[in-house]
Amino acid sequence: MTMNRRDFLRMSAALTAAGMSPSLFAATKEQFTIYGAPAMPSVTIAVAATQGKLAKQADVALEIWRSPDQLRAGVASGQFKVMMSPSNVGVNLRNQGQQVGMVNILTNGITQLMCKGRAITSPQELVGKKILVPFKNDMPDIVLQALLKKLNIDINKVDITYAATPTEAIGLFLLKDFHAAILPEPMASAVVQKAKIVGTEIVRGFDLVKEWGQAFNTKPLIPMAGIIANEEYFDAHKTQFELLHQDLSDALNWIMANRKSAAEIGANYLPAPEAAIEMGLDGARLTVTKASELKNEIMQFYETLMEFNPKLLGGKLPDDKFFLA
């Protein structure tokens, strides 16, 4: 069917009368949705999505997944193309046949040990203690168990209770007689503030990342999470991903210079108040590092996980093609 000038003008007039400009159709931006985790690096993504250059050419949106299981389901269904993920989950998905690869790392260690009353100052002091851990068999649990195994601490002598989410862990921690909880930022800072309201003192325990570095003789960093992407989607949008990398780097610089404003943005996405987000920025060890630039550290982390439990990676280490950027 062809359209002459008179028909085009009639359609334009009708669209205008309906409050729709024909130019809107020509200017429609491609959707670029990033599925973020309920943790601090999503603040970096949120700022990049609102202030970055990519937003000028694409409709950049951030949506938060609630649990690693929802993340896995989103990837398996094909709905999730760009997503923040615990660093082991990307490998696991790839080894299950999902065509995903790693784009970057956004935190070098986001998990904190929060203690009730008195600080637990060493991993050895966890013996005999009641500890809350969210996300069984995912990153907080993995780091704790691998560290204890490396230090020859019997995991059966630590009383671990699992919570479905960090938010649930906070509620249980404050209401029940747990000695400590392992929480990602900003939920670690949120529990400090919530505890004050109910008259409980919460303090930070030993630094998990530093203890990890000493135990495994590595740099004091754990490449815990970053952005992974569908390979085909990445290959078709390499220019956009380069812009995203610059936007994320600029966003992190802006966040550290404008913490209060950054917390206001983050509170729109995370289950934590602005004050907790602002307080938790330092402990989140935020970074924006391309996967290829941190490849040695990432592979060393994966090798540690393989020794601890190969199932965490789906049974094998990733190939070089896993590192997309």
Regions found by a protein language model. Give the residues of each.
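Short, solvent-exposed loop/beta-turn-alpha elements that line the ligand-binding surface or hinge
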Residues: 53-57, 211-217, 287-295
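Pocket-lining segment of extracytoplasmic ligand-binding domains
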Residues: 87-89, 168-171, 175-265
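N-terminal export signals
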Residues: 7-26
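Structured segments of extracytoplasmic/periplasmic soluble domains
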Residues: 48, 74, 129, 147-151, ...
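Conserved C-terminal helix/tail region of periplasmic/extracytoplasmic solute-binding proteins
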Residues: 299-325
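Secondary-structure end/capping motifs
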Residues: 234-308
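Short, glycine-/small- and polar/acidic-enriched structural segments
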Residues: 27-154, 160-161, 179, 185, ...
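Secretory targeting signals
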Residues: 1-3
